[in-house]
Amino acid sequence: MNLNSIPAFDDNYIWVLNDEAGRCLIVDPGDAEPVLNAITANNWQPEAIFLTHHHHDHVGGVKELVEKFPQIVVYGPQETQDKGTTQVVKDGETAFVLGHEFSVITTPGHTLGHICYFSKPYLFCGDTLFSGGCGRLFEGTALQMYQSLKKLSALPDDTLVCCAHEYTLSNMKFALSIFPHDLSINDYYRKVKELRAKNQITLPVILKNERQINVFLRTEDIDLINGINEETLLQQPEERFAWLRSKKDRF
């Protein structure tokens, strides 16, 4: 399968997987127009849509795409049932698309019903995990998001993390404020800065590398523990995650 990214709005990415026959899967189409343009340019035949959560910048293009291609099956969590979903899926279930099984992983935090889709090596994680960061807590709790990230971090090393937003540069600036002397973070920040200066995408990322540079995946890191404890005593990793998320919100 071939992985494609379609820019939308200011910083969204709509991901598309296509097979050799031209059949395609569309993930979180917040806007129909760029997707329709890509379908025409590549002669794709849409088979399915995956929705991760109910926010408009992830579901706004569904209605128009389904009107144009009524054969499309729209998979999504319960919270997207009124956004065009025709097949509600939940944790532990699978969606069989393009000849591949995609596992559904529930990841509450950004929204209460947020889900991700995984078929090795592809992880479509919506607004749960970003490169260098994680989603804001609009509906869920810090504990829920911490547990969701633990699930995703446990996936295979070679997982390709397909995030829904180009937030990497700002996330890495925050990471540097936490770990100013970390070699991996400094190296990745320089790489990302160069890519964005050329208006190039920083995604997808390999999960093995992401674990090294994403402070939200490093809540049990001794350097982080020592650094945080200079300000406040936090004994549990989920407490350190909540502290980081709150600090990032104000960054």
Curated annotation (Swiss-Prot):
Its EC number is 3.1.2.6. It comes from Shigella flexneri. PANTHER family: HYDROXYACYLGLUTATHIONE HYDROLASE, HYDROXYACYLGLUTATHIONE HYDROLASE GLOB. This is Hydroxyacylglutathione hydrolase. Binds 2 Zn(2+) ions per subunit. The keyword Zinc applies. Gene3D superfamilies: Ribonuclease Z/Hydroxyacylglutathione hydrolase-like (3.60.15.10). Monomer. Its cofactor is Zn(2+). The gene is gloB. One of its GO terms (molecular function) is metal ion binding. It catalyses: an S-(2-hydroxyacyl)glutathione + H2O = a 2-hydroxy carboxylate + glutathione + H(+).
